[in-house]
Amino acid sequence: MAEKRNIFLVGPMGAGKSTIGRHLAQQLHMEFLDSDTVIEERTGADIAWVFDVEGEEGFRIREEGVINDLTQEQGIVLATGGGSVISKESRNRLSARGVVVYLETTIEKQLARTQRDKKRPLLQTDEPREVLEALAKERNALYEEVSDYVVRTDDQSAKVVANQIIQMLEER
């Protein structure tokens, strides 16, 4: 992969976007960015606080702005938030400004990977499985719509998935 084109990772929470993104960026000698981390840096507060104070709608407005800004960078690997594809504008920007890889995983893996994470406001409920199932129903088609590639992450290490993505990009 001679040119350093942007790589955008989309998928549900717990799919491994941040972990795989770090491996991918390191192996490709690219900068790694995480849209949720950038939102926290810009607001000076964590995502849960933004959700509490501004609600999901306020968070999504911030997220759309961050996606717009970050997708204009060059030579980055970007891990997006699980809900970033809700915005048509964000989907258009992701598609137009880089290669989009959908990291797909099962509800069971999502539950296992997120069960102790208190930084996920949508999962602060007694029924996280139901929430994840509802989110999958709402978002999976959007992930597929925006993606150039789909990679299943269930039983593979982040390093293996990163290598699979690199191989796909080299064959492109």
Curated annotation (Swiss-Prot):
| Cross-referenced InterPro entries | P-loop_NTPase, Shikimate/glucono_kinase, Shikimate_kinase/TSH1, Shikimate_kinase_CS
Where is the protein localized? Cytoplasm
Q: Identify the pathway.
A: Metabolic intermediate biosynthesis; chorismate biosynthesis; chorismate from D-erythrose 4-phosphate and phosphoenolpyruvate: step 5/7
Know the name of this protein? Answer: Shikimate kinase
Q: Which reaction does it catalyse?
A: shikimate + ATP = 3-phosphoshikimate + ADP + H(+)
Residues given in the record as ATP binding sites: G14, A15, G16, K17, S18, T19, R120, Q156
Cofactor(s) recorded in Swiss-Prot or TrEMBL: Mg(2+)
Organism of origin: Aliivibrio salmonicida (strain LFI1238) (Vibrio salmonicida (strain LFI1238))
Tell me which family the UniProt entry assigns to this protein: Belongs to the shikimate kinase family.
The keyword Nucleotide-binding appears for this protein: yes
Q: Which UniProt keywords apply?
A: Amino-acid biosynthesis, Aromatic amino acid biosynthesis, ATP-binding, Cytoplasm, Kinase, Magnesium, Metal-binding, Nucleotide-binding, Transferase
Main location class: cytoplasm
Matching PROSITE patterns: SHIKIMATE_KINASE
Positions bound to substrate:
D36, R60, G82, R139
- Give me the gene this protein comes from: aroK
- Report the function annotation for this chain: Catalyzes the specific phosphorylation of the 3-hydroxyl group of shikimic acid using ATP as a cosubstrate.
Give the source's domain of life in one word.
Bacteria
**Subunit-structure text:** Monomer.
Q: Which residues cross the membrane?
A: none
